[in-house]
Amino acid sequence: MRLWICLSMIGWTKMSNVFRIMDYLDFLIPNPKCELLYNKDYEFLIAVMLSAQTTDKRVNLVTKDLFCKYDSLDKLRKASLDDVMGFVRPLGNYMKKAKAILLISNILYDDYNGIVPNDREALEGLPMVGRKTANVVLGELFGVSAIGVDTHILRVSKRLGLVSSSNPLVVERVLDDVIPKDKWIRVHHQLVLFGRYYCKAKNPCCDCCKLKDICFK
């Protein structure tokens, strides 16, 4: 039944392209992993939230200093807004992100005994945590099969003809249908890294790409 749903959504030819794409990603990025650095679960949650509209590299620079000064959830939740804003200022939208850090820290401390919940509804109930962030957290911290559609995945999926929509939820549903569930986390990381380093928004590496014959760029 799932196969027929896949075929009805993208067709036989595109379905064969999916397996070709997965094989190429396995060749190009055999050991994919998230590039956000963290030592504790709540640090990862906050890092993913901060990564919106900026780069992982920039987030890592910010969180390294932030979590060095506030090395526990209890210390972080008691930090002043002005101090936290000073740390996250390089990321843009720093006031909202600083407020979200403090709110998330206090909610985790007060409502979840300091533990990041393994629950989508609970995660999406946190400030500035949407479906994409929840998916990334569930996959990285708990091994829950999920694909968090970010700008890289959206761009790559459209260029390779997997989707035509720019709606992240639609893209997620299509990818969920055409990619085996046990590969969701792996392919999520691969697509992010492929978009970040190869199929870039500007100056993509088309000449050396083995998928250029099916690319719609």
What are these regions (language model features)?
Residues 11, 16-217:
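Catalytic cores of DNA base-excision repair glycosylases
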